[in-house]
C-alpha cells in the first residue's frame, strides 16, 4: 500500500459518517424510523386540551381557562356553536330534549340546531340565538320567519313548510323543497265581491269591524268572542259589491248554519276543486265562513273576516281581515258555496 493511502481512506470514512448523520438528523431520528403511535396520539390537533372534546366516545366540555371538565348542567358556546352539558359532564347528542319549558334538538356531534335545518328528513326552525323550538300553536298562529335573507313559513312544532303555498303578512308565497318562500303574483279578478274583499285585508281595529257588523245588526260591535263577525263580513262584501240579492235568501247572514241551509235548499254547493273567485267557503261544523280567492296547486286561498292570529279561540280580540290558505282536502273545510 502507498504510504499516503491510509490518511485518504480515513478522511473518506469520516465524510461518509458525517453525511449519514446529517440525513438522520433531518428525518428527526435514525434513518428510516417512523413516528410511534404514542407520538401521533399526543399531537394537539388530535387531542384538543380545551373546549368541546371527546373522551371515551363521549363529547365533553373543558374550560379553556381552568382546563377543568364541566360537570354542571347548562349551555356552553364554543367556536360559534351552542352545546348543552348534562349533569355529570356529557354533552347532549343526537336527540330532542327539554330544559325547563323549552325544547331543543342536538345533532350527533352535540351542536344545538339553530336557524333552518333538516331533522329526520323534515325542515325545522329554532331560534338562531338560543336554539329554542319556535312552537306557534294552531294553524291560525302560523307565521313567516326571515333567516339569512330568505323567508320561511313556520308551522306547528317548529316545522318549516315545503312544496306548498303559504301566506306571510297577508301576501301569498310558495315554499320550495328547501322551504325558501317566493312571492306569488296576486292574480287580477273581475269578480266584484273579491275586489271588495281584497281592499279590506289587514283591517283589524274595533272601528274597522263596526262597519262590517252594524250594517246588518244596527247596533255596536262588542269586542269579544261572543260576537264573531266572519258572516257579517261576507255579507258586507256582497252588499258593497252590489251582489247581496244572491245571498239575501240565506236570512241571518251572521249565522253560518243559515248560509249552509241556504246552500242545501237551493243546491248551491260546488266541489272544492272547482271553486271560483268570490265563492263562499264554509269551515268545520258551520263554525266559520270566508270568501274564496283562488285555487292553486291543490290549495285554496281565501279572504276571511275574524281571522288571523288575534282570532284564536279563547282570545278577547276581534281578529282581522286576513288572507289564508288551506289544502283542498283539509278536513276543516266543510265545502264551497256558489250563490
Regions found by a protein language model. Name each.
Residues 26-45, 167-210, 273, 299, ...:
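Intrinsically disordered, low-complexity
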Residues 276-280:
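Structural motif
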Residues 185-243:
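N-terminal capping segments
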Residues 5-11, 15-189:
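Extracellular adhesion/carbohydrate-binding repeat motifs centered on closely spaced tryptophans
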Residues 204-207, 241-249, 297-301, 309-313:
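Substrate-binding/catalytic groove segments of enzymes
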Residues 263-271:
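Short alpha-helix capping/helix-loop boundary micro-motifs
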Residues 241-263, 293-294:
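Short, basic/aromatic beta-hairpin or loop at an interaction surface
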Residues 269-270, 285-339:
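Aromatic- and glycine-rich peptidoglycan recognition patches
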Amino acid at each position: 500500500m502507498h504510504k499516503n493511502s491510509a490518511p485518504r481512506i480515513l478522511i473518506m470514512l469520516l465524510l461518509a459518517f458525517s453525511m449519514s448523520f446529517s440525513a438522520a438528523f433531518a428525518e428527526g431520528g435514525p434513518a428510516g424510523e417512523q413516528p410511534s403511535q404514542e407520538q401521533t396520539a399526543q399531537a394537539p390537533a388530535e387531542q384538543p386540551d380545551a373546549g368541546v372534546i371527546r373522551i371515551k366516545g363521549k363529547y365533553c366540555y373543558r374550560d379553556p381557562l381552568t382546563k377543568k371538565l364541566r360537570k354542571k348542567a347548562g349551555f356552553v358556546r364554543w367556536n360559534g356553536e351552542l352545546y348543552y352539558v348534562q349533569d355529570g359532564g356529557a354533552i347532549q347528542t343526537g336527540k330532542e330534549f327539554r330544559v325547563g319549558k323549552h325544547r331543543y334538538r342536538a345533532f350527533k356531534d352535540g351542536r344545538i340546531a339553530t336557524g333552518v335545518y333538516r331533522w329526520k328528513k323534515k325542515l325545522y326552525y329554532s331560534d338562531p340565538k338560543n336554539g329554542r323550538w319556535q312552537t306557534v300553536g294552531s294553524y291560525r298562529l302560523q307565521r313567516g320567519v326571515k333567516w339569512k335573507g330568505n323567508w320561511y313559513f313556520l308551522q306547528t312544532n317548529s316545522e318549516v313548510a315545503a312544496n306548498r303555498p303559504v301566506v306571510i303578512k297577508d301576501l301569498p308565497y310558495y315554499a320550495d323543497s328547501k322551504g325558501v318562500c317566493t312571492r306569488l303574483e296576486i292574480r287580477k279578478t273581475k269578480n266584484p265581491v273579491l275586489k271588495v274583499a281584497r281592499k279590506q285585508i289587514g283591517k283589524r281595529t274595533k272601528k274597522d269591524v263596526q262597519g262590517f257588523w252594524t250594517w246588518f245588526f244596527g247596533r255596536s260591535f262588542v269586542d269579544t268572542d261572543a260576537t264573531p263577525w266572519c258572516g257579517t263580513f261576507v255579507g258586507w262584501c256582497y252588499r258593497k259589491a252590489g251582489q247581496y240579492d244572491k245571498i239575501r235568501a240565506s236570512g241571518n247572514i251572521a249565522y253560518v248554519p243559515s248560509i249552509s241551509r241556504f246552500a242545501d235548499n237551493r243546491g248551491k254547493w260546488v266541489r272544492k276543486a272547482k271553486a271560483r273567485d268570490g265563492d263562499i267557503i264554509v269551515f268545520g261544523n258551520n263554525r266559520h265562513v270566508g270568501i274564496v280567492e283562488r285555487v292553486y296547486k291543490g290549495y285554496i286561498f281565501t279572504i276571511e273576516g275574524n281571522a288571523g292570529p288575534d282570532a284564536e279561540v279563547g282570545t278577547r280580540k276581534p281578529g282581522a281581515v286576513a288572507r289564508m290558505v288551506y289544502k283542498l282536502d283539509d278536513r276543516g273545510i266543510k265545502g264551497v258555496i256558489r250563490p
